[in-house]
UniProtKB/Swiss-Prot annotation:
Annotated function: Diels-Alderase; part of the gene cluster that mediates the biosynthesis of equisetin, a trans-fused decalin-containing tetramic acid with antimicrobial activity. The PKS module of eqxS together with the enoylreductase eqxC catalyze the formation of the polyketide unit which is then conjugated to L-serine by the condensation domain of the eqxS NRPS module. Activity of the Dieckmann cyclase domain (RED) results in release of the Dieckmann product intermediate.
Gene Ontology molecular-function annotations: isomerase activity
Pathway participation: Mycotoxin biosynthesis
Primary gene name: eqx3
Annotated source species: Fusarium heterosporum
Pfam families documented for this protein: DA_C (PF22903), DA_N (PF24137)
Keyword Isomerase: yes
Entries under InterPro entries matching the protein: DA_C (IPR054499)
Listed name of the protein: Diels-Alderase fsa2
Length: 377
């Protein structure tokens, strides 16, 4: 067997009361192996995120695999599973496993398993060392069983660009653009037989790796996430607003956004600007909320932010002619999760199936994606 490095987390031994420094970011790498290898402080977190959506029937799947101190409340490290069928039915479970083991061999191939030995249940993932593919296996009898497969699409990866999201978060996309297949058997609490979920044809998605030594409330007050395919364009966006008094002294929003055309990276914003900014010296993102509906049947989140979508603009550095604009409209709700107490000013986290159209001047491509918006305060 080749040399293997292993990170083993157990709930009773791996949450630290003391500060723990993460291992270093590795440039031009997927950084799939954990950054907190033996213990994680109570504020820190690590996320392995996978998603896929069918452009044909809008079925979608979203998986979040985490290590953080939240497990102390629930008896395990969390894996979230969300699906939405073509007929808009949804299924969601937060599953908790007391043991998490991730290994990497000398080729860079990484395997992770979140498991419960007593119940013989687990959810696992693997990622090839060359980042050509990734897979997940779900084996939680009576709840979810099946698999999900991602295969990297040809072209640029974007891994040689800046991976910071503000001063405190690393945001890496090991498979930022991938074809996706999934087939799951899903059980509801009132059902004796499983429902089958098969991700529709022509599905695209990807895998993200995100970590920070600071908790989400220390990092942001609001966020928007998007991964979409629109004609020849693929886009990936994460944008956050920092809390007042954070390390972001100017209290400016941060982004880690990428735009590809036919597999070629054409714009890589790390800066959020407005249309009023006179001189744009870096690749930049303009992200504006929309609150209009042409048909009167607008889809919004359940909480106080009632926007119906966004206008997304990618602007090339120093060149106003390098501008790509896309309209994003919320089409379906995948999840609504509160982040505050109920009430008229309640905040929350909403996942969407997004419908998009746009391009550069003279273009009008259409496409779909998965989006998520969150308010914490």
């Amino acid at each position: 067997m080749s040399n293997v490095t292993v990170s083993v987390f157990t709930l009773d031994k791996s949450i630290s009361e003391e500060p723990v420094l993460p291992s270093s970011f590795i440039p031009s790498s997927g950084n799939v192996f954990p950054k907190f290898t033996s213990a994680i402080p109570k504020t820190a977190w690590e996320l392995w995120y996978f998603d896929g959506i069918s452009k044909d029937d809008r079925s979608s799947i979203v998986i979040g695999v985490t290590r953080n101190a939240e497990g102390l409340k629930h008896g395990g490290f969390k894996v979230q599973v969300f699906v939405i069928w073509a007929d808009e039915r949804t299924w969601h479970r937060d599953l908790f496993f007391p043991e998490s083991v991730v290994s990497i061999d000398e080729s860079g191939a990484t395997e992770g398993i979140w498991k419960h030995a007593t119940s013989s249940s687990s959810i696992s993932f693997s990622c090839a060392g060359d980042l050509s593919k990734a897979s997940l296996v779900f084996d939680v009898p009576g709840i979810v069983q099946g698999d999900m497969h991602l295969e990297a699409l040809p072209g640029d990866t974007g891994l040689d660009t800046d991976a910071t999201l503000g001063p405190s978060v690393y945001y890496v996309r090991p498979l930022g653009r991938a074809s996706v297949k999934a087939q799951l058997s899903l059980y509801s609490s009132d059902a004796t037989a499983a429902e089958q979920f098969i991700l529709g044809t022509s599905a695209n998605g990807g895998m993200d790796r995100v970590w920070s030594p600071l908790s989400w409330p220390q990092v942001m007050t609001e966020s928007y996430y998007l991964r979409a395919q629109v004609g020849p364009y693929a886009m990936q966006i994460m944008r956050i607003f920092p809390p007042k008094g954070s390390e972001n002294s100017e209290n400016q929003p941060s982004t880690m956004a990428r735009l590809y055309r036919e597999g070629q990276l054409i714009c890589a914003p790390q800066h959020v600007v407005t249309r009023d900014d006179a001189l744009i010296t870096h690749d930049s993102l303009i992200l504006s909320k929309q609150n209009t509906s042409d048909s009167g049947d607008a889809v919004t989140g359940e909480y106080r932010d009632k926007n119906t979508g966004y206008t997304v603009e990618f602007v090339g550095k120093g060149n106003e002619e390098q501008r790509w604009e896309f309209q994003v409209r919320h089409e379906r709700i995948i999840w609504n999760t509160p982040t505050s107490r109920p009430g008229p000013d309640a905040t929350g986290n909403t996942g969407f199936v997004e419908r998009l159209y746009g391009g550069t001047i003279g273009e009008s491509y259409e496409g779909v994606g998965t989006g998520g918006q969150c308010e914490l305060s």
